[in-house]
Amino acid sequence: MSSRAIGAPQEGADMKNKAARLGTYTNWPVQFLEPSRMAASGFYYLGRGDEVRCAFCKVEITNWVRGDDPETDHKRWAPQCPFVRNNAHDTPHDRAPPARSAAAHPQYATEAARLRTFAEWPRGLKQRPEELAEAGFFYTGQGDKTRCFCCDGGLKDWEPDDAPWQQHARWYDRCEYVLLVKGRDFVQRVMTEACVVRDADNEPHIERPAVEAEVADDRLCKICLGAEKTVCFVPCGHVVACGKCAAGVTTCPVCRGQLDKAVRMYQV
């Protein structure tokens, strides 16, 4: 019979039950955070160190310090968690990105304009200008410093394994361009993965091949004719563009009406 750390969640236990979560804190080592408070915030104890996991979104948080608030940290790292959203009394409409504001650098609103800034991009870096421009970045001309045309967020000191979209979402999770093109679920996933503690020596790197599916013609973006239509223009209501193309227009290409905002659509 295999041993199990006292207080660790039992196999098959329903951790969505508060009492079950509370029962995992038998050997909880953090004296300044009450187990009842942790359980009430959706977390159960994993039985190692001070690592906890949400029973609903699976985000894992560790390295708690005095002054930390489990509910606040839960909302910060996993804003789309269903448990967090229910506690906050969010409505389904909150899934839509905020009303579109003016881009910080409108001259770089198109991918082509951003790509042109990478003429002197350092050749030794793994990140290609094409993928950086696609992720919303333009090159500042200094070292490896890049900046988002929309949120004005800057990134530098790129590591070989840094993926532009993931880094953009991780450090600037409220960027309207990221939310419009990639969606809140992508941002949620990136933020969750960023705060999950992994043992680099024991956990293999898993690459999931990208799956490209042909999109029916009637679902294609009418601007680039390559990606799927995912954005609804407000107030006209036309659905004709993908996130990347929508970020670069201020009038609807169908009715030529002025746009108040562009909202990413979700399949339910």
From Swiss-Prot:
Enzyme class, first EC level, given as a word: transferase
BIR repeat windows: 18-84, 111-178
Residues at which Zn(2+) binds: 148, 151, 168, 175
SUPFAM superfamilies with a match to the protein in the record: Inhibitor of apoptosis (IAP) repeat (SSF57924)
Name of one Pfam family that matches: zf-C3HC4_3
Sorted UniProt keywords: Apoptosis, Host-virus interaction, Metal-binding, Modulation of host ubiquitin pathway by viral E3 ligase, Modulation of host ubiquitin pathway by virus, Repeat, Transferase, Ubl conjugation, Ubl conjugation pathway, Zinc, Zinc-finger
One GO biological process term: positive regulation of protein ubiquitination
Reaction catalyzed: S-ubiquitinyl-[E2 ubiquitin-conjugating enzyme]-L-cysteine + [acceptor protein]-L-lysine = [E2 ubiquitin-conjugating enzyme]-L-cysteine + N(6)-ubiquitinyl-[acceptor protein]-L-lysine
Zinc finger (RING-type): 221-256
Superkingdom classification of source: Viruses
Record-listed E.C. numbers: 2.3.2.27
UniProt modification remark: Auto-ubiquitinated.
GO terms for MF: cysteine-type endopeptidase inhibitor activity involved in apoptotic process; ubiquitin protein ligase activity; zinc ion binding
Protein family (similarity comment): Belongs to the IAP family.
PANTHER family (UniProt xref): DEATH-ASSOCIATED INHIBITOR OF APOPTOSIS 1, INHIBITOR OF APOPTOSIS
Name this polypeptide is given: E3 ubiquitin-protein ligase IAP-3
Species whose genome carries this gene: Orgyia pseudotsugata multicapsid polyhedrosis virus (OpMNPV)
Gene (UniProt): IAP3
